């Protein structure tokens, strides 16, 4: 959400009040904001008296954040890196870590970044602006790979039909623009009057997650946060769709001592908890916030409190992401 402050635009992140309450006390605390974005959480943390190291892999976010660094120097440090590297950019243990997963409002609102089909732009979606773009994926990956991407990362039930349409169309003309791809999907799947969700939404989600390796980045970031937090420190994670939230929920459940087996990970002996939940389940936006910011509708906040137990060894299999991890390694 964007609010105006003295005539200037200022980003207000989702679930801000429960995030600040859940990470308190913040005065004098050392906090890592692993997903700086437009700086909404970082600014609020600084205003609450915290010392913040903010990370973002997007060079545009880093450039835009320089005035905030100047304003709050020396209490703010801004670093261009993935949040999975957060335990490598700060030496001391910290009091809190906040992660706001997925694409930022700033990225969605800039058509030239190619994250959204609400405005036409190049089919890009790269947060770090390096590596494969969404256009590269759509125009060059095998049809079976596209089906997997749409089915697993987008939970798209029409994945096969959409992938076959893409393969047929790209032989004639490549997909280079966001609205071109969205339009072709809408023509294929159809859209009834009053449908709230555009038929291309899940495909765009899947492409963005794949291009930026978001689920693997999240799993690595959770373990990194566990390593860097001091006893009593708090890890807050805001997620926006079921894939992300299942990973976060599984992580906190496992770290709390609930270590039931799965088809990916055999049942293991119980071990001392490295986290315990601040509250049961996840917090969602209030009706008041939803009226101001409809984007908060799918947001869910989970917070864990770090114990004195040593961090466990990172094991990606506990998330049940074996299929996704193996598939993504073939990019």
Curated annotation (Swiss-Prot):
It comes from the Bacteria. It is found in: Cytoplasm. CDD domains: AdoMet_MTases (cd02440). GO terms for molecular function: rRNA (cytosine-N4-)-methyltransferase activity. It holds the Pfam family Methyltransf_5. Its EC number is 2.1.1.199. Its main location: cytoplasm. Keywords: Cytoplasm, Methyltransferase, rRNA processing, S-adenosyl-L-methionine, Transferase. It catalyses: cytidine(1402) in 16S rRNA + S-adenosyl-L-methionine = N(4)-methylcytidine(1402) in 16S rRNA + S-adenosyl-L-homocysteine + H(+). It is an enzyme of class 2 (transferase). InterPro entries: RsmH (IPR002903), SAM-dep_MeTrfase_MraW_recog (IPR023397), SAM-dependent_MTases_sf (IPR029063). GO terms for cellular component: cytoplasm. HAMAP family: 16SrRNA_methyltr_H (MF_01007). Belongs to the methyltransferase superfamily. RsmH family. This is Ribosomal RNA small subunit methyltransferase H. It comes from Bartonella bacilliformis (strain ATCC 35685 / KC583 / Herrer 020/F12,63).
């Amino acid at each position: 959400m964007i609010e105006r402050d003295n005539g200037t635009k200022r980003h207000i992140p989702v679930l801000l009040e429960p995030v600040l309450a859940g990470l308190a006390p913040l005065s004098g605390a050392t906090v890592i904001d692993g997903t700086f974005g437009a700086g909404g959480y970082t600014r609020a943390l600084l205003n609450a008296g915290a010392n913040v190291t903010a990370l973002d892999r997007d060079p545009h976010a880093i450039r835009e954040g320089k005035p905030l660094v100047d304003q709050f120097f020396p209490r703010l440090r801004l670093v261009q890196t993935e949040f999975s590297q957060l335990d490598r950019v700060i030496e001391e243990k910290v009091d809190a870590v906040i992660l706001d997963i997925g694409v930022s409002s700033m990225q969605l609102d800039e058509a030239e970044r190619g994250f959204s089909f609400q405005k036409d732009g190049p089919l890009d979606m790269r947060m770090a602006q390096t590596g494969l773009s969404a256009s590269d994926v759509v125009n060059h990956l095998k049809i079976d790979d596209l089906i997997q991407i749409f089915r697993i990362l987008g939970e798209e039930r029409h994945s096969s039909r959409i992938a076959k349409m893409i393969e047929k169309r790209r032989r004639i003309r490549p997909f280079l623009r966001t609205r071109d791809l969205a339009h072709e999907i809408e023509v294929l799947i159809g859209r009834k009057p009053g449908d709230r969700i555009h038929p291309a939404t899940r495909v765009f989600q899947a492409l963005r997650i794949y291009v930026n390796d978001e689920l693997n980045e999240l799993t690595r970031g959770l373990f990194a946060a566990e390593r860097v937090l001091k006893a009593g420190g708090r890890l807050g994670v805001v997620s926006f769709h079921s894939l992300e939230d299942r990973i976060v929920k599984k992580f906190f459940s496992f770290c709390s001592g609930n270590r039931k087996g799965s088809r990916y990970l055999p049942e293991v002996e119980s071990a001392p908890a490295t986290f315990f939940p601040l509250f049961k389940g996840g917090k969602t936006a209030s009706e008041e916030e939803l009226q101001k910011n409809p984007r908060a509708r799918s947001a869910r906040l989970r917070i864990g409190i770090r114990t004195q137990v040593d961090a466990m060894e990172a094991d990606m299999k506990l998330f049940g992401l074996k299929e996704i991890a193996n598939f993504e390694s073939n990019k």
